[in-house]
């Protein structure tokens, strides 16, 4: 019987052990999609206790606690931090088989040197020992990044953001981790949302352009893209809860924009017309600047209206959508390709039923010039588990080039989430090792070791170009 989470955790064969320990383990991290706060990195945030660093803002953990019958008071409410920690400690033993169970114990091991299982009995001891580590001078946002061997952090940023802290970090000479912005213009595309007009006012202020026409709007977006580029941004990110496409023209998009400025009702066709033209406009600009475009497809968000009104978005009430994506995605990408303006693109799906749709779609638009130009993004969110990661890797390998994969992202608000890169690398090495043991790929450790290192770091660095 294997020991729980020992040094060969998730490594079930000799080749996997060799690949992980000799090739993957010590590779740096290139985190090209996360939700860390650049302000907290710049200010080198320190934490009061383990609840603050671990449970604040972590809706993965919140969902489990709710499922365990924990009252909201102990999740997002006014209970004190120790009470919240104990509530989580009561929950985690019920979560065996869930990646959060593994991440919890990996983080305790890697950042606190604690190898005990977290439960109600050990909660007090772990609370005290973890907080002792947190109280040390070297436990801070920047030092956690250094300890995790992170070389690049790419945050998620609204086009109206000042990027104040990215600029300050860029100017620092003694901090050698790159902290770069990503351009996330969802609020500029979601014309049907209640906050669209108020966001336009923010865009006016940020761009210095008075927006009274669709041309003004596009010019303001373009100006913000150029500003982001000047600060080091080389990647955009779009949350496509559904994949829109409507055969359209600039004139049609202009009409829709005029209607929304006068607060008239929009049809779905009008909404999709506006989104399609605007998205194509943005894609062309990304291609011109050699940016990467990320499309996160398939989340069904804010399902619980009652809790959304109380807590707002990103609080644990999202799930997987099941709408068709193939046709609209094909037409959207093709519209850019026709004009020679399809940027490097990473497609993520939240619905694993669409794995083969995405993995085969990228093959339609590889250009024979940029290796791995079109990417099937890492297993995302609800798929970020052992089975989900393996399925994404196997699907990509079955119909594409695994060796060109740009690898894992944390997609997290937590500074401790870099343990997820270790989790991913162990699963990657185990899968390749399994193929070797079965005689499905050659036992060429140098070839396989290079592929593992490339997926762990090198491919992402080359692909992003920064």
Swiss-Prot record:
One of its GO terms (molecular function) is glucuronate isomerase activity. It catalyses: D-glucuronate = D-fructuronate; aldehydo-D-galacturonate = keto-D-tagaturonate. SUPFAM superfamilies: Metallo-dependent hydrolases. It holds the Pfam family UxaC. The keyword Isomerase applies. Keywords: Isomerase. The keyword Transmembrane does not apply. PANTHER family: URONATE ISOMERASE. This is Uronate isomerase. It comes from Caldanaerobacter subterraneus subsp. tengcongensis (strain DSM 15242 / JCM 11007 / NBRC 100824 / MB4) (Thermoanaerobacter tengcongensis). The lineage of its organism: Bacteria, Bacillati, Bacillota, Clostridia, Thermoanaerobacterales.
């Amino acid at each position: 019987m294997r020991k729980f989470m020992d040094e060969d955790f998730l490594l079930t064969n000799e080749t996997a052990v060799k690949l992980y320990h000799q090739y993957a383990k010590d590779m740096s991290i290139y985190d090209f999609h996360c939700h860390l706060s650049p302000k907290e990195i710049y200010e080198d945030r320190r934490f009061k206790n383990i609840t603050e660093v671990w449970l604040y803002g972590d809706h993965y953990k919140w969902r489990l606690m709710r499922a365990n019958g924990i009252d909201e008071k102990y999740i997002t409410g006014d209970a004190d931090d120790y009470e919240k920690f104990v509530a989580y400690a009561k929950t985690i033993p019920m979560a065996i088989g869930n990646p959060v169970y593994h991440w919890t114990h990996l983080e305790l091991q890697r950042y606190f040197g604690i190898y005990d299982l977290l439960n109600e009995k050990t909660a007090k001891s772990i609370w005290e020992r973890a907080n002792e580590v947190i109280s040390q001078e070297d436990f801070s946002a920047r030092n956690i990044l250094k300890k995790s061997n992170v070389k690049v952090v790419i945050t998620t940023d609204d086009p109206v953001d000042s990027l104040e802290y990215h600029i300050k970090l860029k100017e620092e000479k003694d901090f050698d981790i790159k902290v770069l912005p990503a351009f996330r213009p969802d609020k500029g595309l979601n014309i049907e949302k209640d906050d669209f007009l108020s966001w336009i006012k923010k865009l006016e202020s940020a761009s210095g352009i008075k927006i009274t026409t669709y041309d003004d709007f596009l010019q303001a977006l373009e100006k913000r893209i150029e500003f982001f580029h000047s600060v080091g941004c080389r990647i955009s990110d779009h949350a496509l809860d559904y994949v829109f496409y409507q055969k359209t023209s600039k004139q049609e998009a202009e009409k829709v924009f005029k209607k929304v400025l006068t607060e008239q009702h929009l049809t779905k066709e009008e909404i999709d017309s506006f989104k399609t033209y605007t998205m194509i406009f943005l894609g062309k600009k990304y291609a011109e600047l050699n940016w990467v475009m990320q499309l996160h497809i398939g989340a069904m968000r804010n399902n619980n209206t009652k809790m959304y009104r109380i807590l707002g978005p990103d609080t644990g009430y999202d799930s997987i959508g099941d709408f068709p994506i193939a046709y609209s995605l094909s037409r959207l990408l093709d519209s850019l390709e026709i004009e020679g303006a399809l940027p490097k693109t990473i497609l993520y799906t939240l619905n694993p039923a669409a794995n083969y749709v995405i993995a085969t779609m990228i093959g339609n638009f590889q250009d024979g010039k940029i290796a791995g130009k079109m990417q099937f993004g890492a297993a995302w969110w609800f798929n970020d588990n052992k089975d989900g990661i393996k399925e994404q890797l196997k699907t990509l390998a079955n119909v594409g080039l695994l060796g060109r994969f740009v690898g894992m992202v944390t997609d997290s608000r937590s500074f401790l989430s870099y343990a997820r890169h270790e989790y991913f690398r162990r699963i990657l090495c185990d899968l390749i090792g399994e193929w070797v043991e079965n005689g499905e790929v050659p036992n060429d450790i140098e070839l396989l070791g290079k592929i593992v290192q490339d997926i762990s770091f090198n491919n992402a660095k080359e692909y992003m170009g920064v």
